[in-house]
């Protein structure tokens, strides 16, 4: 596998959950858009969503992906354990958020992942996933993997 896309808690509710912040696209819509781009670029992509921190950590530890795209959702601001999982596997990842976390409540402005991420994309709605995948493809091509 080339790219793993991980989505954290409550992202299974996209399309109906707070559309002011997150838009009207569902997670399935976003995944379908990414799958098309991946196929056009001969990239193998897999998708995973969980509301449970431990399951996300297990997925991070077990993946054979060359690069990970993650929207950790609320775990962004709370999970040292997810941070430690990324440090343990020593693989690049791109942190993504639909909304601009720096333009939200104060408690949402701290990310436990940003400083160790390959890159971060915030505030572009569902298009942020596309931007992240384009950069993941660039990374894979740059590494010649």
From Swiss-Prot:
Fetch the InterPro entries from UniProt: DHquinase_II, DHquinase_II_CS, DHquinase_II_sf
What's any GO biological process attached to this entry? aromatic amino acid family biosynthetic process
Q: Where is this site: Transition state stabilizer?
A: 17
A Gene Ontology molecular function term of the record: 3-dehydroquinate dehydratase activity
Identify the EC number(s).
4.2.1.10
Catalyses: 3-dehydroquinate = 3-dehydroshikimate + H2O
Q: Give the record's pathway.
A: Metabolic intermediate biosynthesis; chorismate biosynthesis; chorismate from D-erythrose 4-phosphate and phosphoenolpyruvate: step 3/7
Keywords for this protein: Amino-acid biosynthesis, Aromatic amino acid biosynthesis, Lyase
| Disulphide bonds in the chain | none
The catalytic residues are 22 (proton acceptor), 97 (proton donor)
Please tell me where substrate binds in this chain: 71, 77, 84, 98-99, 108
What does the subunit section of this Swiss-Prot or TrEMBL entry state? Homododecamer.
Record's HAMAP family?
A: AroQ
Q: Which family does it belong to?
A: Belongs to the type-II 3-dehydroquinase family.
Q: What is its biological role?
A: Catalyzes a trans-dehydration via an enolate intermediate.
Q: What is the recorded name of this protein?
A: 3-dehydroquinate dehydratase
Q: Which organism is it from?
A: Francisella tularensis subsp. mediasiatica (strain FSC147)
